[in-house]
Swiss-Prot record:
The lineage of its organism: Bacteria, Pseudomonadati, Pseudomonadota, Gammaproteobacteria, Enterobacterales. Pfam families: BolA (PF01722). PANTHER family: BOLA TRANSCRIPTION REGULATOR (PTHR46229), BOLA-LIKE PROTEIN 1 (PTHR46229:SF2). Gene3D superfamilies: BolA-like. InterPro entries: BolA, BolA-like_sf, BolA/IbaG_stress_morph_reg. It comes from Buchnera aphidicola subsp. Schizaphis graminum (strain Sg). Belongs to the BolA/IbaG family. This is Uncharacterized protein BUsg_457. It comes from the Bacteria. SUPFAM superfamilies: BolA-like.
Amino acid sequence: MLLEKIKKYLEFKINIAFIKIYDESKLHNYSTNTNTISHLKVIIVSDDFINKNLIIRHRIIFKALKEIEKESIYSITLYTYTLNEWKDKKYKEFNSIKCIQKKIKNFVLKN
Protein backbone atom coordinates (compact mmCIF):
# COMPACT_ATOMS: atom_id res chain seq x y z
CA MET A 1 0.00 0.00 0.00
CA LEU A 2 1.21 3.49 -0.86
CA LEU A 3 0.80 4.91 2.66
CA GLU A 4 3.01 2.23 4.17
CA LYS A 5 5.59 2.75 1.42
CA ILE A 6 5.68 6.49 2.13
CA LYS A 7 6.03 5.85 5.86
CA LYS A 8 8.92 3.43 5.35
CA TYR A 9 10.74 5.81 2.99
CA LEU A 10 10.42 8.69 5.42
CA GLU A 11 11.56 6.55 8.36
CA PHE A 12 14.58 5.46 6.32
CA LYS A 13 15.54 9.01 5.29
CA ILE A 14 14.64 10.99 8.44
CA ASN A 15 15.19 10.23 12.13
CA ILE A 16 11.49 10.15 13.08
CA ALA A 17 10.13 10.10 16.64
CA PHE A 18 6.49 9.97 15.49
CA ILE A 19 4.74 9.76 12.14
CA LYS A 20 1.11 9.46 11.16
CA ILE A 21 -0.20 9.49 7.60
CA TYR A 22 -3.86 10.00 6.73
CA ASP A 23 -5.54 9.37 3.39
CA GLU A 24 -7.88 12.34 3.03
CA SER A 25 -8.90 11.65 -0.55
CA LYS A 26 -12.55 11.18 0.38
CA LEU A 27 -12.69 14.79 1.60
CA HIS A 28 -11.96 16.05 -1.91
CA ASN A 29 -13.40 15.90 -5.42
CA TYR A 30 -10.08 15.39 -7.17
CA SER A 31 -10.81 11.91 -8.48
CA THR A 32 -13.95 9.94 -9.22
CA ASN A 33 -12.02 6.74 -8.48
CA THR A 34 -12.64 6.00 -4.80
CA ASN A 35 -9.54 3.78 -4.63
CA THR A 36 -7.17 6.56 -5.69
CA ILE A 37 -5.04 8.21 -3.03
CA SER A 38 -4.96 11.86 -4.04
CA HIS A 39 -4.73 13.86 -0.79
CA LEU A 40 -2.58 13.07 2.23
CA LYS A 41 -2.08 14.61 5.65
CA VAL A 42 1.27 13.77 7.24
CA ILE A 43 2.31 14.53 10.80
CA ILE A 44 6.04 14.10 11.36
CA VAL A 45 7.95 14.66 14.59
CA SER A 46 11.73 14.68 14.32
CA ASP A 47 14.61 16.43 15.98
CA ASP A 48 16.12 16.64 12.48
CA PHE A 49 13.87 19.74 12.24
CA ILE A 50 15.61 21.60 15.09
CA ASN A 51 16.67 25.11 13.95
CA LYS A 52 15.02 24.59 10.55
CA ASN A 53 12.20 26.77 9.31
CA LEU A 54 9.01 25.39 7.79
CA ILE A 55 10.24 25.62 4.20
CA ILE A 56 13.44 23.70 4.96
CA ARG A 57 11.45 21.05 6.85
CA HIS A 58 9.14 20.57 3.88
CA ARG A 59 12.10 20.39 1.50
CA ILE A 60 13.62 17.61 3.63
CA ILE A 61 10.39 15.63 3.36
CA PHE A 62 9.85 16.21 -0.35
CA LYS A 63 13.47 15.28 -1.06
CA ALA A 64 12.90 12.01 0.81
CA LEU A 65 9.67 11.39 -1.13
CA LYS A 66 10.94 12.20 -4.61
CA GLU A 67 11.88 8.55 -5.21
CA ILE A 68 8.32 7.33 -4.60
CA GLU A 69 5.71 7.00 -7.30
CA LYS A 70 3.37 9.85 -6.49
CA GLU A 71 1.56 10.33 -9.77
CA SER A 72 -1.84 9.96 -8.11
CA ILE A 73 -1.01 12.26 -5.19
CA TYR A 74 -2.40 15.71 -5.82
CA SER A 75 -1.82 17.27 -2.40
CA ILE A 76 0.18 16.61 0.75
CA THR A 77 -0.52 18.60 3.90
CA LEU A 78 2.49 18.52 6.21
CA TYR A 79 2.63 19.12 9.93
CA THR A 80 6.29 19.09 10.97
CA TYR A 81 7.47 19.41 14.55
CA THR A 82 10.52 18.88 16.69
CA LEU A 83 9.94 16.67 19.72
CA ASN A 84 9.70 19.71 22.03
CA GLU A 85 7.25 21.48 19.70
CA TRP A 86 5.10 18.35 19.58
CA LYS A 87 5.11 18.13 23.39
CA ASP A 88 4.17 21.83 23.62
CA LYS A 89 1.20 21.11 21.34
CA LYS A 90 0.26 18.34 23.78
CA TYR A 91 0.39 15.85 20.91
CA LYS A 92 -2.61 17.53 19.30
CA GLU A 93 -3.59 16.55 15.79
CA PHE A 94 -5.49 19.05 13.70
CA ASN A 95 -8.82 18.37 12.06
CA SER A 96 -8.91 18.22 8.31
CA ILE A 97 -10.81 20.70 6.21
CA LYS A 98 -13.10 19.57 3.43
CA CYS A 99 -12.19 20.69 -0.03
CA ILE A 100 -13.99 23.88 -1.10
CA GLN A 101 -14.96 22.21 -4.38
CA LYS A 102 -16.67 19.41 -2.46
CA LYS A 103 -18.53 21.94 -0.30
CA ILE A 104 -19.71 23.83 -3.40
CA LYS A 105 -20.80 20.64 -5.17
CA ASN A 106 -22.75 19.45 -2.12
CA PHE A 107 -24.38 22.88 -1.75
CA VAL A 108 -25.45 22.94 -5.40
CA LEU A 109 -26.84 19.40 -5.21
CA LYS A 110 -28.89 20.19 -2.10
CA ASN A 111 -30.33 23.47 -3.40
